[in-house]
Amino acid sequence: MPLKSFFFSAFLVLCLSKFTQGVGTTEKEESLSPLELNILQNKFASYYANDTITVKGITIGGWLVTEPYITPSLYRNATSLAKQQNSSSNISIVDEFTLCKTLGYNTSLTLLDNHFKTWITEDDFEQIKTNGFNLVRIPIGYWAWKQNTDKNLYIDNITFNDPYVSDGLQLKYLNNALEWAQKYELNVWLDLHGAPGSQNGFDNSGERILYGDLGWLRLNNTKELTLAIWRDMFQTFLNKGDKSPVVGIQIVNEPLGGKIDVSDITEMYYEAFDLLKKNQNSSDNTTFVIHDGFQGIGHWNLELNPTYQNVSHHYFNLTGANYSSQDILVDHHHYEVFTDAQLAETQFARIENIINYGDSIHKELSFHPAVVGEWSGAITDCATWLNGVGVGARYDGSYYNTTLFTTNDKPVGTCISQNSLADWTQDYRDRVRQFIEAQLATYSSKTTGWIFWNWKTEDAVEWDYLKLKEANLFPSPFDNYTYFKADGSIEEKFSSSLSAQAFPRTTSSVLSSTTTSRKSKNAAISNKLTTSQLLPIKNMSLTWKASVCALAITIAALCASL
């Protein structure tokens, strides 16, 4: 076939496939076409030869910073204890801040100490090593540095009023974790997951703030206390050589650019890096980790980069500092479940998003190393309390019945992933496995590494490595793919199971009675408009689709005649 004719035919097939997409019922599932399969195969093959991965990590979230959806029993117990103390029906425990405030010092201390003692033990670290991970990310809150709860006195005699319980409790268990990591030859990445006043309003920062202003860098002493904690972290964990497993320090997790001015976040990053350099010996190679602040990939390329001093000097004079751009690692977090548009995507689109995301990160690597420091197996937001205690799921529409946020989108379907694995359909299992494999194959080939969220939960299976592995939904070893080959290309059998329609969309608003409360991982940014919302292609009329397709065919015919 002449080359021009081939391209014309391929273009026509593609146009017709797009023309028919969305016409008729949305409940019919369509398998990948050979063209779509070839697109994905080519995308994976393009970068797979560049084996850049150094990090194969796991996070032990929900431990030293508690999270309701990871251990809901802890929060149910806290509510029960509060009711015993006070018969008021007004009890609302939604995060660690309100847990400590409601229960008071003694009860909170007993409850949390037992949780720290039992949720993560030495056995977990041994299993993490056995399962093939080489790094453990340990989230910890700023309140671990509280030295006198009665006086709200922190390190460096800084006073900051909050109800958190500490007096060295979290740091004691952190030291245990470092000893276990050293014993089992695991690297550790320390992560300041909660900053004073909350840096994002998510419950995993310690304090859930769904609608109000954030306190970090706004309230008195939040900046001073943050700097004091960073200084202590650097003085404590740098320059230890082989005596310490700490290889990276993430100065703050997920500062929410937009609700916090990005220039303020950037300035804090520079001040933190200056503190690190002042406390770091020339032989120390501990990595300075920054989160992307929810800015686009590539945003931080020129920052903290000695090649671009004209950029850096606006915030800090680092001319005399001896450092390389490779000393600063950018941490990206990626989930596909915290907007309506993501939840409504087809499985093909979801996996293509992952491939494109990896491609974009790969282009960053010449500026700074970059990892996907949080990702999961979740393809819905249905896990109990994922969006917050008392908050529902976007997937079944209950999110909008339990918050002040609104949407024009219909629910995608009925939640099932919050149920026991035994109640999952085989189709749902297949999709979760495919999604996990796509991320492993992409992040292993196109980034500096990955860190899965999370090691374990009580019942949020899509976020639970141990449960996913046990159900054969997470490859073990990590490259033991079902849908991909060792070179990263896609198995042919993927074409029969990877559907072009993620899930049948319900025609009515079917709500699950079991999904009335979820965790607000990204509740504060859930209403940002996505591309599909700004350009609703799927909602085009049939006449408009036909017009567009006719125009495309005309252009293709002209090209073929040249």
Swiss-Prot record:
Glycosylated residues, chain numbering: 50, 77, 86, 90, 106, 157, 220, 281, 285, 310, 317, 322, 401, 480, 539
A GO term, aspect molecular function: glucan exo-1,3-beta-glucosidase activity
Enzyme class: hydrolase
Organism encoding this protein: Saccharomyces cerevisiae (strain ATCC 204508 / S288c)
Active site: residue positions: E254 (proton donor), H334 (nucleophile)
Origin: domain of life: Eukaryota
Compartment list: Cell membrane
Native organism taxonomy: Eukaryota, Fungi, Dikarya, Ascomycota, Saccharomycotina
PROSITE patterns according to UniProt: GLYCOSYL_HYDROL_F5
GO biological process, one term: glucan catabolic process
More info: Present with 2410 molecules/cell in log phase SD medium.
Keywords from the named record: Cell membrane, Cell wall biogenesis/degradation, Glycoprotein, Glycosidase, GPI-anchor, Hydrolase, Lipoprotein, Membrane, Signal
GO cellular component: extracellular region; fungal-type cell wall; plasma membrane; side of membrane
Protein name (database record): Glucan 1,3-beta-glucosidase 2
